[in-house]
């Protein structure tokens, strides 16, 4: 772990005792701080106690005793309303921080020879794939790399730092809201589209949270900016005018005179005097579709920012094994391929997967996001049939009515069973695509659990076929 410095002998309240909170609590104690731990959920409190932590009921505590309050990323700061912990901290004058801020301060306080390189990645979609891809390139290039953050590994639980290490961190807008001291050697903003507006209030506030990743960069640092959306293009233009760092625009939709871009699956490096083709991404089996070409362009540019040669970065792109729940083929039964894209928690992410197939049987729904699936109407002709689950099912059925066949399946298991029956009956090669365009929290703990439910339902079909054989 990374012992947190700066709070020796003082008490830090930690609210939220899932992976991030517990990793932070361990790191604070290792650094000499005292901790006051609490969570609204009894199961989370029990897990902390099972690990040997004492609990402090923060609803009854004197908050003036806390040097800082460490909040887990899911705790709302402003919208739809400030969480009670936020109000109590502000009343007591206690500083509110997140685990990334604790990490950043610890790095900044370390001697120069011990400070690692930091790559920080954000964006609306593609963060996890790009984070894992950069980590893969670094590892294959012989770097001592540690991957963490929003990808599922609390940063403070990673191995302690040294001057030769590279930390590759996926950062959500929630985490960036609580971060002000991070200085990343390489930053990546992949793309920006409307998401999490129930948490940020407005699109301007959401974009502002994403831009926080650029704080504290200066001469010698690199910013990789996706310019295929208007928000990214605007950020790129504005920071180019500031002229403080190396800026590398990336695109998967257009050729550029400067930057890194992918056209028809071919990756070009235009950071030198002329554009050079460096990779044929269509040969990278784990990076299908234009959205993954953007991820690859960003990862390549980030690796170059770390001093890895273009030839080596391109070579290691091709051996990336992929990530679970991101356009992951989980099984092929006869002529039917089952694709798990459970990570598609909004319509824009679902668009990436839907655009990759000419026809598909679509499993969608869950806890709806603002805007629903209205923005996907141009892709409805590709839908052989839709199988709708969760809270969004009735609303999605209304949107699809008259445009694509749809049925309200209710559960993932029922949807898989129905989709397979229809695809099998058609007698042709077919895709059954789970790309929900929704959050998962109405039926599952997270998108991973939803993806595993899909995998289990497909396995049940496979087992049934084996028994019948």
UniProtKB/Swiss-Prot annotation:
EC annotation from Swiss-Prot or TrEMBL: 6.3.2.9
Entry-linked Pfam families: Mur_ligase_C, Mur_ligase_M
UniProt record, GO biological process: cell division; cell wall organization; peptidoglycan biosynthetic process; regulation of cell shape
InterPro entries named in the record: Mur-like_cat_sf, Mur_ligase_C, Mur_ligase_C_dom_sf, Mur_ligase_cen, MurD
Keywords: ATP-binding, Cell cycle, Cell division, Cell shape, Cell wall biogenesis/degradation, Cytoplasm, Ligase, Nucleotide-binding, Peptidoglycan synthesis
Entry's family note: Belongs to the MurCDEF family.
Protein name: UDP-N-acetylmuramoylalanine--D-glutamate ligase
Species of the source: Phenylobacterium zucineum (strain HLK1)
